[in-house]
From Swiss-Prot:
Entry's family note: Belongs to the FBPase class 3 family.
GO molecular function: fructose 1,6-bisphosphate 1-phosphatase activity
UniProt keyword Hydrolase present: yes
Names of required cofactors: Mn(2+)
Gene: fbp
Top-level EC class: hydrolase
Name of the molecule in the record: Fructose-1,6-bisphosphatase class 3
């Protein structure tokens, strides 16, 4: 193969570029455009975390931009519209299809409705003009309803200074109404407003878990205009299951059974659980209280006795398969330091006791019917067959493939973005605040380097789905449960103890020291520096651990350098957090933390008017308004400008 020098490579690159910019005028226009964009204010970033499958609450926060939509409406119309009119307009932007139907029922004749159409279209045009004031026209065009771009642009940029086009603009709107296009135009404009108030979305982990509709969240994210994802521990569990880890798959199914969410697997992703049910009904009883499914907060009707019986049996069957599958992984990976989790080998089956962490406990609610005392890791032939079938079904589910591929494409373990560090779980540290080391494949890693190696293995496992017991696949499971995992953030996962030991002291899962050290501003500054970020300007934006505001815990820690935005989207946590989640807004003026109250139903918003569910707290205000030049995107644009200027000097200037 011929070696190409750097000089030759540069020439070839400039040759290719010159085909696109084949005149100095074209090149100059592009440079002028990019240089000008750098001077625009940075767009609004929206941070959400720990969605846990709660689609209804998540999509409401997405539709209202964490209160940003209402704030923009108030800015323009608070002195022009009544409270009811403000509420109706806000609800229309949030849920345009539903609100339109309700509003249309209020009118007695078409004349009144047409007047409302004209007024509402004008209000939405004003709102779009205001929300898009820091965007280029080309960026705004991409946010407009595609089929009505011409009409909307004419209305946005109308200039009637000399009254020459008055009837032209009136005819535009009247024809939209006459041709029965007003509803579709209003719906399109409402979604344009939603899109314009948020430039970019950051999902700081855990789309999946116990909530009922993570698949709908994934579909929403796939269609979102601009976003990134920092994987959470539950997300990686699903990735691991799809990538070939049977122990991840067993964990995932156990959690779904525990929280009565098996319909995610069966109905949403089309996985046949009949073989697992057949196995469960053969070996397990329906009256084991430790394995009865938890009541779902979103389900009003109770499970039938038959449904509860089936789930209880499945729950036991998959839990025992999980504990068996963990044994060979732990034994072939001594560097995981997980010998204490060889739980089935630590059980005394004669006395019905277990000794873990040098303490012996009596066991309750046991279901060891399928365990071979002499070889607890051994799966029954039926268990092996069931897991093989389930893994094949997972890997052949088209919808799951699409969702997991999107998670990989848009996701990462952490993200440095615009001077901040976004990470779901933690950076593993010891009590002294030193980065903890972990050995992988004979080499020791810590800090950012450790997270990079973890991510490499997640991607490798995903690319090599046919390998089910290689190092990369085992490391995906380790990220779910290991003590040096940046996603788990605890010393051990006590799943077995929670099922079978009454003494709650044995259930305790000790957190990584990171979680108390993150209160210390110097520690946070050190972590930012270790990840190559400016500790004077940067912050760590964290999820994973619910903030117990009800007990006085503050999500703003370390003098504002650490922001924790898991406040409890998951209904299961809301009684302990006291709220229904935090989100974060970061625009060119600074940062605002938004605390959300529990979202009950959109019907109340539609019928009774807007009940604002958020309380904003200023985290900081920028001394100087931040421009695109100061962002990651700005650095990318500057790099493009530098190359284009190089081409200009090389080809067109003396």
């Amino acid at each position: 193969m011929t070696q190409i020098t750097e000089r030759e490579l540069k020439k070839k690159y400039l040759d290719l570029l010159s085909q696109r910019f084949d005149t100095p005028e074209k090149l100059a226009t592009e440079i002028i455009n990019l240089e000008s964009i750098l001077e625009l204010p940075k767009g609004t970033e929206h941070f959400v975390s720990d969605l846990h499958g709660e689609y209804e609450a998540f999509q409401h926060v997405l539709r209202n931009g964490s209160g940003n939509v209402r704030a923009k409406i108030n800015d323009i119309f608070k002195d022009k519209l009544s409270t009811k009119e403000l509420n109706d307009l806000t609800a229309l932007v949030y849920y345009p299809e539903d609100k339109l139907q309700l509003i249309k029922c209020d009118f007695q004749n078409y004349g009144q409705l047409n007047v409302w159409y004209i007024t509402t279209i004008e209000h939405l045009i004003q709102l779009i003009k205001y929300c898009s004031s820091k965007y280029t026209r080309s960026k705004l065009r991409r946010a407009l309803p595609e089929q009505y771009v011409f009409i909307v642009e004419e209305l946005l940029y109308k200039n009637n200074e000399f009254k020459n086009k008055k009837s032209y603009y009136e005819t535009l709107v009247n024809q939209v109404i006459e041709l029965k296009q007003a509803d579709d135009l209003i719906i399109g404009l409402a979604y344009s407003v939603q899109r314009l108030v948020v430039d970019h979305l950051h999902v700081v982990g855990d789309i999946y878990d116990r909530g009922p509709q993570p698949d709908k969240i994934m579909d929403t994210l796939i269609n979102y205009h601009s976003l990134d994802i920092q994987w959470g521990n539950h997300d990686v569990l699903w990735v691991g299951a799809y990538a070939g880890s049977k122990v991840c798959l067993a964990n995932l199914l156990r959690i779904c059974a525990r929280y009565d969410n098996l319909d995610i697997v069966e109905d949403a992703y089309g996985i046949n659980l009949r073989p697992l049910l057949t196995l469960a009904e053969k070996y397990y009883d329906a009256d084991n209280p430790a394995f009865k499914p938890k009541k779902r907060p979103d389900k009003h009707e109770r499970l039938t006795q038959r449904e509860e019986s089936q789930i209880t049996k499945i729950h036991q069957a998959i839990a025992m398969i999980q504990f068996k599958l963990e044994i060979p992984v732990i034994k072939r990976r001594p560097n995981f330091e997980m010998d204490e989790r060889l739980v089935l080998e630590k059980v005394n089956y004669d006395t019905n006791e277990i000794t873990v962490y040098r303490k012996t406990y009596p066991l309750k609610d046991t279901c060891f019917q399928t365990v071979n005392r002499d070889n607890p890791a051994e799966l029954l032939p039926e268990e092996e067959e069931v897991m093989n079938k389930l893994l094949l079904s997972f890997q052949q589910s088209e919808k799951l493939r699409r969702h997991m591929s999107f998670l990989m494409r848009k996701g990462s373990l952490y993200l440095p973005c615009n001077g901040n560090l976004l990470i779901h779980g933690c950076i593993p540290v010891d009590e002294n605040g030193e980065m903890e080391s972990f050995e992988i494949d004979g080499q020791t890693y810590s800090g950012q380097e450790l997270l990079d190696v973890f991510e490499y293995h997640v991607r490798k496992s995903f690319d090599e789905k046919e390998n089910t017991d290689d190092l990369s696949t085992d490391l995906v499971w380790y990220l779910w449960t290991g003590k040096y995992s940046s996603l788990f953030g605890k010393r051990a996962m006590t799943t077995f103890e929670r099922y079978f030991i009454a003494d709650k002291a044995s259930h305790k899962e000790e957190k990584n020291p990171y979680y108390h050290l993150r209160e210390d501003v110097n520690m946070v500054r050190k972590m930012l520096s270790d990840f190559g970020l400016n500790p004077d300007e940067g912050r760590i934006i964290n999820g994973h651990t619910p903030v117990k505001e009800i007990n006085g815990e503050d999500p703003i820690k370390a003098d504002g350098k650490m922001l924790v935005i898991d406040g409890g989207f998951s209904k299961a946590y809301q009684s302990t957090t006291g709220i229904a989640g935090y989100t974060l807004l970061y625009n060119s003026f600074g940062m605002q933390l938004v605390a959300h109250q529990q979202f009950n139903a959109k019907e109340k918003i539609l019928s009774e008017g807007i009940e604002e569910l958020s309380i904003k707290r200023i985290v900081d205000k920028e001394l100087q308004r931040k421009k695109i030049r100061n962002t990651n995107k700005g650095k990318e644009l500057q790099a493009q400008i530098d190359i284009l200027k190089m081409l200009m000097h090389d080809r067109y200037l003396d």
